[in-house]
């Protein structure tokens, strides 16, 4: 069941990342049994790593914290709908549910290419029913607006 405080934590994580110049406005929180297991944010620029998206960063930390590669019974909160790469990692990690704020189209409006990759990879009709659920888009759009007004590197 959706809990807004976990999305707020993802937003805070994303803000910290963009304030440090680490990457885009993408933060994530992983929750298990109502407890935060890990948070992460986009570190593409900081780490010179095109795979270090917020969801991937959070998954890596959660797996280390739990000392397992299997995040069954975990939920992921993210400021944006996962790109195809992140979605694949989420599925590989066995995360049960994803709550997201902004859409791939919102990402494109601030300069990111997620929608392009989505078209290449195909639709999401094969996903389990209600696997992806959108919440708090307006809160996440505020974060995107803030980011869009910054001097930044788009990748």
Where are these regions (language model features)?
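Zinc-dependent deaminase
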Residues: 1-19, 82, 89-155
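Short beta->alpha transition motifs characteristic of CBS
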Residues: 37-44
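Short beta-strand scaffold segments in enzyme catalytic cores
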Residues: 25-34
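Helix-adjacent hinge/juxtasegments
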Residues: 48-52, 56-93
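Short, basic and Ser/Thr-rich N-terminal targeting/leader segments
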Residues: 22-26, 72
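Active-site phosphate/pyrophosphate-handling residues
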Residues: 5, 35, 57
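Short secondary-structure boundary/capping segments
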Residues: 28, 67-68, 122-124
